[in-house]
Amino acid sequence: HYMYDKNGKIINGWKLKQTKSKALYPAEHFVVGGRDYILLAEENRTLNILNRRGETRVKVKEKIDFSSNKLQVVKGKSLAETRIIAIDKKGAQQNILFDGSIDNSIQFEFDQNIQYTYTKQHHILIEGEDLKVNGPQMNLLYSFENESLSAAKLFNVENEHYLSITDTKTAEAYLFREPNEMVEGFPMYGKTTGIAEDMNLDGKINFITAGESGTLYNYAVE
């Protein structure tokens, strides 16, 4: 294994050359309490918590049957209150503390077909055809007609939060605005999760999504 900087150059001094099994997804970097933590989950159910040199910073005491959901870090007021959240293959939430233990006092059971993300202080949960968002700016419950939903993405544009998600079966792209309203005119045609951005830096928001054969669609958001 190698660590690269933002320019694609290998970082010297990286100690971890090989894991005991295949990495499930790319390593993720978090800063907690001013210290670097690099998380790397393996097929053999091992969670590596490393420092920026690739050395073990925290040894996790138990094995975890990782699902396809990426690891999330929920930051508390202190390191002791901060936890790594993993959803295992049975749909159970595993709360890994930064002393290497797993806190089983807080347990949530989800459907195995779950997508969970924690971003911008918001919990985003997709179970089947249901979307649930909970956080400081957005609190949203929405049920779609199908379970064929893309991963949801949260954006902060012009000091407002927007969430995009796409029903890939019907090719309908949805855009929600804080706290819980669908943007007027949506859903629109699209096959991929859209991006909300002020493309021209003119205070007007664009919504970009792709259709068949990679064709891009640029919608104006009212």
Question: At which residue positions do the language-model features occur?
Answer:
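Loop/turn residues immediately N-terminal
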Residues: 1-2, 43-48, 89-94, 128-132, ...
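Short loop/turn segments that connect beta-strands within beta-propeller blades
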Residues: 5-7, 52-54, 98-101, 135-137, ...
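Aromatic (tryptophan-biased) beta-strands that constitute blades/sheets of beta-rich domains
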Residues: 9-20, 56-62, 102-108, 139-145, ...
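Repeated scaffold domains used in trafficking and secretory/extracellular systems
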Residues: 20-29, 65-76, 109-121, 146-156, ...
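Acidic, glycine-anchored loop motifs typical of Ca2+
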Residues: 32-37, 75-83, 118-125, 156-162, ...
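Eukaryotic tandem repeat interaction scaffolds
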Residues: 62, 83-156
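Loop/turn-rich, solvent-exposed surfaces of beta-rich toroidal or solenoidal domains
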Residues: 148-173
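Blade-level signature of beta-propeller repeat domains, shared across WD40, Kelch, NHL, RCC1
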Residues: 194-222
